[in-house]
UniProtKB/Swiss-Prot annotation:
Belongs to the DNA mismatch repair MutS family. Keywords: ATP-binding, DNA damage, DNA repair, DNA-binding, Nucleotide-binding. It comes from Streptococcus gordonii (strain Challis / ATCC 35105 / BCRC 15272 / CH1 / DL1 / V288). Gene3D superfamilies: 1.10.1420.10, DNA repair protein MutS, domain I, MutS, connector domain, P-loop containing nucleotide triphosphate hydrolases. This is DNA mismatch repair protein MutS.
Length: 847
């Protein structure tokens, strides 16, 4: 980009752009934000706006594009959604009073992680994450600038950090220099995150406190430094950082949350068909965000769970009060985001009126809860701070019909400020005086169509057509000449106009000053408002739980101190709601102290996966504090859920379905405890039959003997059902079918014992495959079944591993193959059987 022979204004642009090379620079020029050079070319394509040029007649015209100032936010949103940063350079002085080039400065850098005013649904958070490392430990901090939420934790490894970032649905990560190049590549390329670097951590005792580890303080400090670097203002709404531990909640990795459709349907990416969709009867944006958080972070503290259940029980018992409560909550606006607008200095009269309206509903909400007189509600009632003095200030000061733009006037109520009322009186009387002058001069001059008009250039003037110019009084003086008329003024009119303009200017300045004082006063209540927002959100979520419990016929679960689990006629509430209660077949499940594993067999499409997901959903709902879909539910409190349900190739990272299966299985058996829940669906199908069966058996044995977690293991390897004879804590169950006259009906009912058939050909028939193809498949199946009767396909016991060994021997026959080097390097004495088998399976692919 050439800098010679350019205007002072363009030199100013280049000087500013030099410091913001990684962002689109929106350069304020009058009523437009202009972009130049490469920014203009790229923005024109992304935003679909016209690309023009500056100095069109020069040899090297400068590419230029612009967006109107008043509608800039929608264009900024598009750039942010596309993954870019946007730097806003504002005019720092009135162009009319500027000497030379108008002073301009960047006042804010908006990024995917710091955007506040956007089209993002108000029921969702927008988290900015920071990630750093000290030795082998990782620090992770996150913040939502729109709500002020600020959290930090320490993590054991990079995989765990990536999982937490995925759970937060972050789009931008502030990284420290301690992260390796490979780690940064994974974040930016595989996870498609915008990475932003910060050199020094910020030290803020008020926000960071002195209770964090050095790693956590460093990570949270870098996040703060980045936020203040980009926002360039005081952010009084930021909450003091809260330290949390992953282990304080029911642990679920991103794959588990995705496969269980917790907050969105994995297939459609939409809310419909998710647990959040089922549970969301909230009335406020704050409640919606809190519900989403509770779904993703179920509790493991029995006391906290029961406290939530107690409130839900109260709301179920008091239907009419709950209905009144819901109606009152509908009048509650998004306090958290209103507070952030105060902190950002972006509050308009509408925001303050919404805040006052919300505060006016709090006494009613409190009264409803007090009427119930339940100990379960006492702590919530105590935290419902209506802040009446703030509501009175706003209600008495802000006009209900005030415009959103604070410089347009008519913001402050009449009667709030005596001086302002005097200015307004002068303006009103001036209008009356002008009408009197018009009538007086019309009568004196005899000009019947004489009238007084106004425009910004000429001010107030008498409008006289050319045909009446001969009747113009001598005390009129000419102000402007037009084609068919002329404009005149008088000393009296000029005096009245001067008084009115002075009053209007002083009124506008005073109104702005009063509004700023009120906004500053509101800022003093930020912490109390945030505490109120949290309480209202909690009340909202718990009343939502009660509404769903009633409409979906849920029951209150109990929790045992043992590891036994009993669910009578359990249901998958989301599936039930989608398909209708009349069509859904409930299933019971019992895993007592002596049973850890259920091996599930049965036809494809018969309901094995739904049965497994049903248990996970009931556990999650119970530990959220919600009621659950069953007739009776007695559960232990689980510390983690691990799943492998469904298979989708990870094409981005180049990992096969089988490799993903093995990684998820490894995570489960390594991290699960006796108080965990494992759900494995058709594990091993991503590789050859014998490999898959061997791995499945080894995994089952490992869980049975060492992990001892409660496990549902669905398999198409019917030979594995023989394991019940040697594994005492394993039981077989199957999905029942009805076969009559060659027709098969899936009953979707779980029964004891193994299945005897897979009915895969019947599923193919349902899918509509050609009849002759199905006949051929049936014939082949008959031949294979006859052959199977003559062969054993499963080791009789865990000590008889000859067949598995024979299958594995295929990998070592080619002695000259370079894969042998990798095989020799395997540290098998420090690997689990599963890791050995997975590694060998990967080596097999290289042969």
């Amino acid at each position: 980009m050439a800098t010679e022979k350019i205007s002072p204004g363009m030199q100013q642009y280049l000087d500013i752009k030099k410091d913001y090379q990684d962002a689109f620079l929106l350069f304020r020029m009058g009523d437009f934000y202009e972009l130049f050079y490469e920014d203009a070319v790229n923005a024109a394509q992304i935003l679909e706006i016209a690309l023009t040029s500056r100095n069109k007649n020069s040899e090297n015209p400068i590419p230029m594009a612009g967006v109107p100032y008043h509608s800039a936010q929608q264009y900024i949103d598009v750039l942010i959604e596309s993954g870019y940063k946007v730097a806003i350079a504002e005019q720092m002085e009135d162009p009319k009073q500027a000497v030379g080039v108008v002073k301009r400065e960047v006042v804010q850098v908006i990024t995917p992680g710091t955007v506040v005013d956007s089209s993002k649904p108000v029921g969702e958070n927008n988290f900015l994450v920071a990630l750093d490392r000290q030795e082998q430990a990782y620090g992770l901090a996150y913040m939502d600038l729109a709500t002020g939420e600020f959290q930090v934790t320490s993590l054991a490894d990079f995989d765990q950090a990536c999982g937490e970032i995925r759970n937060l649905r972050a789009r931008e990560v502030v990284v420290g220099y301690c992260l390796s190049e490979d780690e940064q590549q994974i974040l930016s390329k595989q996870m498609n995150l915008l990475l932003s670097e910060v050199e020094e951590a910020m030290e803020d005792v008020q926000l960071l406190g002195d209770e964090l580890s050095s790693l956590e303080k460093q990570t949270a400090g870098k996040l703060l430094a980045y936020v203040f670097q980009t926002q360039m203002r005081e952010l009084s709404h930021l909450k003091k950082v809260h330290h949390y531990e992953i282990k304080d909640f029911l642990q679920m990795d991103y794959a588990t949350k995705t496969s269980l459709d917790l907050t969105e349907n994995a297939r459609t990416g939409k809310k419909h068909g998710s647990l959040f969709w089922l549970m969301d009867e909230t009335k406020t944006a704050m409640g919606g965000r809190l519900l989403r958080s509770w779904i993703q972070h179920p509790l493991i503290d029995k006391g906290r769970i029961i406290k939530r259940q107690d409130v839900v029980q109260v709301f179920l018992d008091y239907f009419f009060e709950r209905s009144d409560l819901a109606d009152s909550l509908k009048g509650v606006y998004d306090i958290e985001r209103l507070v952030s607008r105060v902190s950002f200095g972006k509050t308009n009269p509408k925001d303050l009126l919404q805040l006052a309206s919300t505060l006016s509903h709090v006494p009613q909400i409190r009264s409803i809860l007090e009427t119930i007189e339940s100990p379960a509600l006492e702590s919530l009632v105590a935290r419902l701070d209506a802040i009446p003095e703030l509501e009175n200030l706003i209600s008495s000061a802000i006009d209900p019909d005030a415009p959103q733009v604070i410089t347009e006037g008519n913001i402050i109520r009449t009667g709030f400020d005596e001086t302002l009322d005097q200015y307004r009186l002068v303006m009103r009387e001036g209008t009356s005086w002008i009408a009197d002058i018009e009538a007086k001069e019309r009568e004196a001059s005899g000009i019947t169509n004489l009238k007084i008009d106004y425009n910004k250039k000429d001010g107030y003037y008498f409008h006289v057509t050319n045909s009446q110019l001969g009747n113009v009084p001598s005390h009129f003086f000419r102000k402007a000449t037009l084609k068919n008329s002329e404009r005149f003024g008088t000393e009296e009119l000029a005096r009245i106009e001067g008084e009115m303009l002075e009053a209007r200017e002083k009124s506008a300045n005073l109104e702005y000053e009063i509004f700023m004082r009120i906004r500053e006063e509101v800022g003093k209540y930020i912490q109390r408002l945030q505490a109120l927002a949290q309480t209202l959100a909690t009340v909202d979520v718990l009343q939502s739980f009660a509404v769903v419990a009633e409409s979906q016929h849920l029951v209150r679960p109990s929790f045992t101190s043992s590891r036994s689990l009993q669910i009578k006629k359990g249901r998958h509430a989301v599936v039930e709601k989608v398909m209708g209660a009349q069509s859904y077949i409930p299933n019971s499940i019992e895993l007592d102290q002596e049973t850890d594993i259920q091996l599930i067999t049965g036809p494809n499409m018969s309901g094995k996966s739904t049965y497994m997901r049903q248990l996970a959903m009931i556990v999650i709902m119970a530990q959220m504090g919600s009621y659950v879909p069953a007739e009776v539910a007695s559960l232990p409190i689980f510390d983690a859920i691990f799943t492998r349900i469904g298979a989708a190739d990870d094409l981005v990272s180049g990992q096969s379905t089988f490799m993903v299966e093995m990684m998820e299985a490894n995570r489960a058996i390594r991290q699960a405890s006796e108080r965990s829940l494992i759900l494995f669906d058709e594990l091993g199908r991503g590789t050859a039959t014998y490999d898959g069966m061997a791995l499945a058996q080894a995994i089952i044995e490992y869980i049975h003997d060492r992990t001892k977690a409660k496990t549902l293991f669905a398999t198409h390897y019917h030979e594995l059902t023989d394991l019940s004879s040697s594994l005492t804590r394993l039981e077989n169950v199957h999905v029942a079918t009805l076969e009559k006259d060659g027709q098969v009906t899936f009953l979707h009912k779980i029964e004891a014992g193994p299945a005897d058939k897979s009915y895969g050909i019947h599923v193919a028939k349902i899918a509509g495959l050609p009849t002759d193809l199905l006949r051929r498949a049936d014939a082949i199946l008959t031949d294979l079944e006859n052959q199977e009767k003559r062969e054993a396909s499963l080791p009789a016991s865990r000590t008889d591993s000859q067949k598995v060994s024979e299958q594995m021997s295929l990998f070592v026959e080619e002695t000259e193959n370079p894969v042998l080097t990798e095989l020799r390097d395997l540290d098998i004495y420090n690997m689990t059987p599963l890791e050995v088998m997975a590694a060998v399976a990967e080596l097999k692919k290289k042969l």
